[in-house]
């Protein structure tokens, strides 16, 4: 009698992808000015500016996404380098319920950010001073495409996977 655990029936694979807009922009003019002022070779310095410096609203989304990823990693086990992680079937219902809450809250934060975005751009003009360039601020509808909260579930392969095959060899 074979009492070995069948990983394909006791676990599944899950992939989680959370994207957020960085609101960072390379300022080539400032980079060049610093290179010239410091006597460096061309393109030694890259000056990146935070387009929404001082607002903190986007930081809240980025931190929330990081916490969601950390929670996901705590609930799952590493499986592959492409982002797939192993989720025990026994944890699926709780995992999915919490994931739905995380997604709902993330989307609410994004909606709040997009609603405030025009005011945040106006505030950035004061924060950035001479570095402010209105053309670097896309329309809110374009910014909305920079945010996403996606996940997929897949069965654990039953053959053709090194981990599965090595397990069979030692049974």
Q: Model-predicted segments: where are they?
A:
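Conserved small/polar residues in nucleotide/adenosyl-binding loops
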Residues: 169-171
């Amino acid at each position: 009698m074979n009492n070995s655990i069948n990983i394909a029936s006791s676990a599944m694979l899950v992939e989680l992808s959370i994207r957020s807009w960085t609101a960072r922009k390379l300022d080539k003019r400032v980079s060049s000015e610093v290179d010239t002022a410091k006597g460096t070779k061309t393109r030694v310095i890259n000056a990146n500016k935070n387009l929404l410096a001082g607002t903190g609203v986007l930081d809240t989304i980025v931190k929330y996404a990081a916490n969601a990823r950390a929670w996901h990693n705590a609930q799952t086990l590493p499986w592959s380098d492409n982002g797939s992680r192993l989720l025990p079937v026994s944890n699926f219902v709780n995992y999915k319920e919490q994931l739905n809450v995380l997604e709902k809250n993330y989307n609410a934060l994004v909606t709040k950010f997009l609603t405030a975005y025009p005011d945040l751009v106006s505030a950035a003009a004061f924060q950035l001073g001479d570095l402010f360039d209105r053309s670097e601020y896309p329309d809110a509808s374009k910014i909305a495409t920079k945010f996403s909260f996606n996940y997929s579930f897949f069965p654990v392969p039953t053959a053709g996977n090194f981990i599965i095959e090595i397990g069979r060899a030692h049974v």
